[in-house]
Curated annotation (Swiss-Prot):
Tree of life domain: Eukaryota
Keywords noted in UniProt: Developmental protein, Disulfide bond, Growth factor binding, Growth regulation, Secreted, Signal
Residues annotated as domain Thyroglobulin type-1: 166-248
Annotated stretches, region: Disordered: 107-128, 144-170, 238-265
Compartment list: Secreted
Organism listed in the record: Danio rerio (Zebrafish)
Signal peptide region: 1-17
Main location: secreted
Name of the featured protein: Insulin-like growth factor-binding protein 2-B
Function field: IGF-binding proteins prolong the half-life of the IGFs and have been shown to either inhibit or stimulate the growth promoting effects of the IGFs on cell culture. They alter the interaction of IGFs with their cell surface receptors.
Any one GO CC term of the record: extracellular region
């Protein structure tokens, strides 16, 4: 998960705008273990606090919390008509679009810090989450809660109207958002140990779990990924947690992806 996008979840109308986060140093040893790029592309650092160089996503390509960064001058935005933009970003259904200028022009040093480029073995500089992330956060959280309030209002207005039940994955996501809103911050420092412990469920368009689930990158290493049952979110026994692609497509059509039986529930 991208730490920058995670920071965007914590900004509410600028009230937490002064919280500062620092990623661990990208040592030469960690960078030496990175896989070599075989194609020519714009190079950016891995999402979150990863240290390895990866190819940036280009304009119009899908992007989200778990994907690599967009290229220079681009940001990952949810669609304008999305009812739940935050969930769209978590599902990897955003798009890399031209960055919306919502803040004064940054200095060269601030721009380099914000771009996420690989900076040798130096520690990534301390930075404040930009206002463009605050913009995404405000839209996402406001629409998320407005949608919930609308469903509650419609149910009260007409008791006979069936209320769509949230899936297990959506309920789990709501709990994570609630935990974030209740987090306490002290001395203008973000409790990174708490943030890294957060487990964002990766839900698909229908509200079920995406087959591939991942932890956010920490300590210069990409987060572990694994395959789950789309109905329960439980890790498939034969699927190991790996720092890369767990190849979840191998389970398509297999019994591992079947809904649980009444006895299993």
């Amino acid at each position: 998960m991208s730490l920058a996008l995670l920071c965007s979840l914590l900004l509410v109308h600028g009230s937490l705008g002064e919280i500062v986060f620092r990623c661990p140093s990208c040592t030469a040893e960690r960078q030496a273990a990175c896989p070599k790029l075989t194609t020519s592309c714009e190079i950016v650092r891995e999402p979150g606090c990863g240290c390895c160089p990866v190819c940036a996503r280009q304009k119009g390509e899908l992007c989200g919390v778990y994907t690599t960064r967009c290229g220079s001058g681009l940001r990952c935005y949810p669609s304008a008509n999305s009812e739940l933009p935050l969930e769209q970003l978590i599902q990897g259904l955003g798009r890399c679009e031209n960055k919306v200028d919502l803040e004064p022009t940054m200095t060269n040093q601030e721009s380099a810090a914000h771009s996420g480029e690989v900076n040798g073995t130096r520690s990534p500089p301390m930075k404040k989450p930009g206002k463009d992330y605050q913009y995404i956060k405000e839209i996402a959280v406001n629409k998320h809660h407005n949608n919930k309030r609308t469903r509650m209002y419609n149910t009260q207005d007409d008791p006979k109207t069936p209320h769509p039940k949230q899936s297990q994955c959506q309920q789990e996501l709501d709990k994570v958002l609630e935990n974030i809103s209740r987090m306490a911050f002290h001395d203008n420092k973000g409790p990174l140990e708490n943030l890294y412990d957060l487990k964002f469920p990766n839900c698909d368009k229908t509200g079920q779990y995406n087959l591939k689930q991942c932890h956010m990158s920490t300590h210069g290493q990409r987060g572990e990924c694994w395959c789950v049952n789309p109905y329960t979110g439980v890790q498939i026994p034969s699927s190991d947690k790996v720092r890369g692609d767990p190849n979840c497509s191998q389970y398509y059509g297999g019994p591992e992806l079947e809904p649980p039986t009444a006895q299993q529930k």
